[in-house]
Amino acid sequence: MITIKNERELQSMRQACKITAAARALAGEMVKPGVSTKAIDKAVYDFIVSQGAKPSFLNYNGFPASACISVNSTIIHGIPGGYVLKEGDIVSVDVGAFYQGFHGDCAATFACGAISTEAQRLIDVTRQSFFEGLKQVRKGNRVQDISHAIQTYVESNGFSVVRSFVGHGVGRKLHEDPEVPNFGAAGRGPRLLPGMTLAIEPMVNEGTYDVRILKDGWTTVTADGKLSAHYENTVLITDGEPEILTVTEGL
């Protein structure tokens, strides 16, 4: 069921999203050679808790960390651990915070030091594809108007969108209806209504869109071992322009 948030609920959700966005920015600042993914996860946990919130991902369906940290060919759900970042890595950080009964959810891919031109292009196209989709976030449009815009932009740049995982509604639950694919024909799916909140999250691969899940049951990698990037914000549908609830200057 798709939930419509009232203004009182949105006040709490805006604060949850503000905390989430700040945690993403903090994680991004830590993406440097010599830093372990576990250290980034601890910083995310400490920050979220310091704000009176809870990490949305920690123990969610058994996930063992506060942030999903996915390096290079890992698309999503990377489990932080002892891996030490090195020059040239690209690092996707996905975070969520639960505050006053509501979740925020956002992600971005960061460059670790100097990266290849193609890796930077992948990051840039992934981010811009979100904003291409955002142009379709208007009252009365349909969910797959967003999907089609993202897919069209990504594929026109020679990359592929992941099919196996999609964006989603977000609110009192981390994952709510509707699903928001990053692919598909325009004009399909539920209509967008004011008060809906969506986590729009292009996951873009350098090569094939096929994925493989590792034995830990979480870590999802590209089937061909090529790079992947991720960009996500929580967005509110309004009567006019959409509102990015996890907005962060420069991200």
Feature-to-residue mapping (PLM):
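Active-site neighborhoods and metal-handling regions in enzymes and metal-associated proteins
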Residues: 1-251
